[in-house]
Amino acid sequence: MAASTAALRGITKQYKDFTLGPVDMTVPAGSIVGLIGENGAGKTTLLKILCGVNRADDGTVDLLGGSPADAATRAKIGVVFEDAFFYGSFTAAQVARSLAGMYGARWNADSFSAYLRRFGLDAGKKLKEYSRGMRLKLSLAAALAHDPELLVLDEATAGLDPV
């Protein structure tokens, strides 16, 4: 693995009433990093830029030696966003496959099933039958199932019971 997992240089993002940055940050390999700030400070925006969900207006992101714009790089990460939305008629397995597909990750049904069992979830259960905490566990199972090099969590423990 590289000396750093992620390096952000001069990252800015402009919204109507808010400007993020410039942000310079390096995440050393093997580290655990938390972003702490007030509501609306731009933490989720920064994570979405890191993962290639949003684009910065300026600056560069080096993610695992590549660009978050590249599918091969995105396939190396596991992501849980607090605001992820899926239709309630989807089953847990359909949601997880969709999440893996969004990031280009290889689908590992055996690993996903093991995480579902560990978290007490049912792959065939419809999303509309899951509580918010159960949905977060589902997102976490999907993010972990392909053994990512980097795990990005956006408030992934808010409303989550212990596992």
Model segments located where?
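Conserved beta-strand
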Residues: 8-11, 18-28, 59
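The feature captures the beta-strand-to-loop junction immediately N-terminal to the Walker
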Residues: 36-38
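Conserved ABC transporter NBD signature motif
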Residues: 51, 59-73
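ABC-family P-loop ATPase nucleotide-binding domains
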Residues: 83-138
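Conserved catalytic motifs of ABC-family nucleotide-binding domains
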Residues: 147
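Catalytic Walker B motif of ABC-type/P-loop ATPase nucleotide-binding domains
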Residues: 151-155, 160
